[in-house]
Amino acid sequence: MNYMPIVIPEDIDKYFYNRNKEFKILNTNLEMLEEGIPNQFLITGYRGIGKTSLLKKLLKNLPDKFLTTYIDLSDVYGRQKGKLSEEEVIKEFLCLIEESIESNEKIVRTAKERLYDTLNQLKLKSYNFNNSNLRDLPLPIIKDNYNKLSKYVMELPQKVVDSFDEIKGFIIVIDEFQLLKNLENPEAFFWLIRSYTQKQYNVSYIFTGSVSNTAEINNMINGQTGAFGGRMFQLNIDEFSKQQTKEYIDKYSNNIKFDDEGFERFYKCTRGIPAYINSFCNILPNNMICTSEIIKEAFIMNIDNIALLWLRVWGTLTDKEKELIIMFVENGSLDWTSLVNNVSYTPVTLSHYLDLLSNKGIIEYSSDGKYYLSDIMLKRWLNLKKQTRGRYPE
């Protein structure tokens, strides 16, 4: 029996589909690290589009001459109960870079010893490492020594490359980068990274996240006045076309078949987004022709399974964020004046929450000056919950 995974599978190569073009683009540009050409990347796309799968596949298949570190900021955000500080992020960078060094058999014997020797040479206030676990490093110690530690962490990847002939480059992926907007001064943090990339020739950063194309954080990092000033290699991961969706289902599903109208409705529901395709296919009947009515009924009956990622996101939102989303559900796209007239708080507060939703990839801003929900699946899920339960989810 075939099963289409709704989480990233262990055997990522088995389920990798239709991202060969993007894979080759990234792989080719990263190979330039060996030549001292450090490209920096910004990868965006809808939730569930396959950004993380693409990057996991990319890192898995890179040659051993490249060290890689994968930093998922949602892990830090979750551990800190929705709060994020520069100190915690720097600590995460340090811990995961250390893990990358330790996992490389070519350098493990000497690298950790050098790492701690160098850290102790920083002469931090009231702290000595003594080969203790970096995870145990107290945040107040980092705060008191932030300038020293941030400089050390930012310089470390290039120093590793310079210290070992076998290592030709260091690649650092920062997933859910939009969470950096929660820092006290996110712009300063982006500029911190930028300032070191200008002096490093074998280190590449890959920022990725589910953010709107018009999100403020995109401009903050790669806009004309942003830290990287438009110099990042920017790649948006697109949805599957109808033909690609058909081929994907034929290859990986448990013999799911459609008539023409059934497939049209299925594609309209999923919009070619792999996460929705997988979860929907897993609940459809196999070895029979799925008609438009079968698709409609299955969608309504299983909306919580199909829109699972939005259930998770909804639980993390504030009341004001939910209030704004429901306003878009009930009214469609809205301009600034309409929004101001329909909320009970100040325009400054409204602007703050619109920025939050945009940076989370939930709303976008159109060329005609209106805000709207970026993913219609969220609207469908909320509407169906209201119809079946008489109220929106809390």
Language-model regions, residue ranges each:
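Walker A/P-loop-proximal flanking segment of P-loop NTPase domains
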Residues: M1-L62
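The catalytic "switch" region of P-loop NTPases
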Residues: V7-D11, I167-V173, F177-C269, I283-N287, ...
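P-loop NTPase nucleotide-binding core
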Residues: P38-F170, L180, P186
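Alpha-helical DNA-recognition elements
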Residues: N61, L192, I283, L356-K360
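Winged-helix-like regulatory helical subdomains adjacent to P-loop NTPase cores
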Residues: N278-P347
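Short amphipathic alpha-helical interaction segments
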Residues: V343-K360, Y365
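Short, amphipathic alpha-helical interaction segments positioned at domain boundaries
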Residues: I376-E394
